[in-house]
Amino acid sequence: MKNKILIAVTLFVCTVASSCNNWLDVTPQAQVNADKLFSTPEGYESAVYGIYTAMTDASIYGTHMTFGFMDVLAQYYYASWDKSHNLYECSQYHYNNGTTQNLISNLWLKSYNTIANCNVLLERLKGQSPSFFPEGEYNLIYGEVLALRAFLHFDLLRAFAPSWNVDKEALCLPYADNFGDKIYRQKKTTEIVRALIHDLDTARILLKPVDRAVQDEFKDMYNHYVTDADNVFLSARAYRMNYWAVTGLLARVYHYMGDPKAYTYANEVIQALRDGYFQFTPESALSAPVKTRDVIMQNEVLFALNYSGIHDLWYSYDASTTTDYEIDGVSRLYPSGDDFRGQYLVTAGKAGYEVSIKYADVKSDKGGKIPMIRLSEMFLIAAESGFDQDKENAIALLEELRLNRGIGAEISATISAEKFREELTIEARREFLGEGQMFYWYKRLGLPVGLDEIEVSPATFCLPLPATEVEFGNRTEDYIKN
């Protein structure tokens, strides 16, 4: 039984081919002979690609932890007004509703299943010699998978636990840091964050010397996406959990805590922009015909999931049914007619409602991707985290982001901290549409949700644990308090 990964922990594998996008083509298997899989470096590579593909499942980042459930909770859509909408109950925070319970349960199970696959791979790596791999690949895989495990845990923490400011000592979630059949105990938020940061710090150390994403050749945008036929795995680094993505994730974690270190990590990524590793998206790339439009602003992406079928799950470009994601309040969200996002990334669907085209069926390398961490978030984090220390710089960062979105209005030098946070919040809402981040922003700050400012209690900000976890896993939900 040791050498089988059974249905409870389905290991996703795929074949590495010569194209940087071929890791999308994955065959899930109910059970895989682990010894055979991990008998070659290519087997380890396939297991890494399989983790990414598992993350594109509709129950998590393929839909519900991005543009689906999490953005419904953030009140982006008309779902909150339409009782016939299949996600109406979710929009009302009716967590006891059957549909909502199923979404939450599947989100939990698939996330921890994917974490288990990370742990299977990490356990195998511990028993393998670095010399078994091409030079540098052992550290690359180890760092990458450590960071992916941290990424998954952090989103579970943000979704289910009280915010850091409400109760950082809450006994809330398991941190599954090894593979086994034991029931992991719930840990305090502080314990989980400490484990997250340890994993991410380790990942950065492992990745920096070997990751092509930090080499000078990466300053040529073409090299973000080109692959080396001799080693596809080492060369296709643009969207994977690379060094910059790990740095951005650390900024996100410290921002969640309200720790000034958030500025340090966010600023490191911003400096990478200054040094040529990233580029803001010009209007010409956004105003191109829809089929070739840069809908995800690819040169600003730190981490994304490749998923060629995303447009099949995102019905909005052909909006006509109750499963669509019609945006509520577009004119209020993008009041400036000059805002590139309002001009080029939102359109009218068949039913006449305005919808995003971020996941439209774009027939180019600019589509079929789900942004997980982007450059713009680093500007928002640095601006908020650095406001008290350097107000002028914080204002300049927000103005720079807005200028690169077509908004030229200056921000008053006398703006208050409260008003500045309001400006950051609306800018975040414009940026994060379809990406599942905005609900966490409101929760972190304890703000009313959406353009209509719906009051949400601390308890409602916490997703309830699946009933099976409480009943059979001996979990407590005592931390969920009004």
Predicted segments with their positions:
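Aromatic-residue-lined binding/catalytic grooves and analogous aromatic/hydrophobic interfacial grooves
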Residues: 21, 212-215, 243-278, 480-481
